């Protein structure tokens, strides 16, 4: 895992997948590399990107730039877990994300673990169902993260106060 500093922002980068791809041309085969990278600030922002080039380092650089462009903010509960359970789908891949008590840790498979580590989540239980393709699982995980909402945002949508939408929400300190 490497750190990238840009605009006073430290981002962690995780290389999730590297493939050698082949293009058959008139004169034979042309080889290139494909890379998939997850980038995050460990404080609630994460992004994923894909890049292709003739060299691995170039593909990784392109993937990193694509990931930075696609970064998104995710509301976290106490800066350690998600606010509520959520399901995400992408093609044949399906992921279930469940919030967890403090001290549980990150219980998730490979590519999902990279996302949660870059996001800054410390306690979560994640289960993948169906396809285990890296691209599909990351896409499904981002679909689930897009569906997350903090109690504050739900209250604003309903034109209510935070303590009116849930019995337990009066105890929640909103960190957005």
Swiss-Prot record:
GO molecular function: rRNA binding; structural constituent of ribosome
TM ranges: none
Pfam families: Ribosomal_S5, Ribosomal_S5_C
Top-level lineage group: Bacteria
GO cellular component assignments: small ribosomal subunit
Domain S5 DRBM: 11-74
Database matches in InterPro entries: Ribosomal_Su5_D2-typ_SF, Ribosomal_uS5, Ribosomal_uS5_bac-type, Ribosomal_uS5_C, Ribosomal_uS5_N, Ribosomal_uS5_N_CS, Ribsml_uS5_D2-typ_fold_subgr
GO term, biological process aspect, one: translation
Subunit architecture: Part of the 30S ribosomal subunit. Contacts proteins S4 and S8.
Alphabetized PANTHER family for the sequence: MITOCHONDRIAL RIBOSOMAL PROTEIN S5
Stored NCBIfam families: rpsE_bact
Domain notes: The N-terminal domain interacts with the head of the 30S subunit; the C-terminal domain interacts with the body and contacts protein S4. The interaction surface between S4 and S5 is involved in control of translational fidelity.
Its job: With S4 and S12 plays an important role in translational accuracy. Located at the back of the 30S subunit body where it stabilizes the conformation of the head with respect to the body.
Family recorded in the similarity comment: Belongs to the universal ribosomal protein uS5 family.
Family annotation (HAMAP family): Ribosomal_uS5_B
Protein name per UniProt: Small ribosomal subunit protein uS5
Organism: Rickettsia peacockii (strain Rustic)
Species lineage: Bacteria, Pseudomonadati, Pseudomonadota, Alphaproteobacteria, Rickettsiales
Gene name of this polypeptide: rpsE
């Amino acid at each position: 895992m490497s750190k990238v500093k840009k605009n006073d922002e430290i981002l962690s980068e995780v290389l999730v997948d590297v493939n050698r791809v082949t293009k058959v041309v008139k004169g034979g085969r042309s080889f290139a590399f494909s890379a998939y990278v997850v980038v995050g600030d460990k404080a609630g922002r994460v992004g994923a990107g894909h890049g292709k080039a003739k060299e691995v380092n170039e593909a990784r650089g392109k993937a990193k730039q694509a990931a930075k462009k696609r970064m998104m903010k995710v509301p976290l509960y106490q800066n350690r877990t998600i606010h509520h359970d959520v399901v995400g789908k992408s093609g044949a891949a399906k992921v279930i994300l469940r919030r967890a008590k403090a001290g549980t840790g990150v219980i998730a498979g490979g590519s999902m673990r990279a996302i949660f580590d870059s996001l800054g989540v410390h306690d979560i239980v994640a289960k993948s169902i169906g396809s285990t393709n890296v691209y599909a699982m990351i896409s499904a995980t981002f679909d689930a993260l897009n569906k997350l909402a903090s109690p504050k945002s739900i209250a604003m949508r309903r034109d209510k106060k935070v303590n009116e939408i849930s019995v337990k929400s009066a105890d929640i300190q909103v960190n957005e």
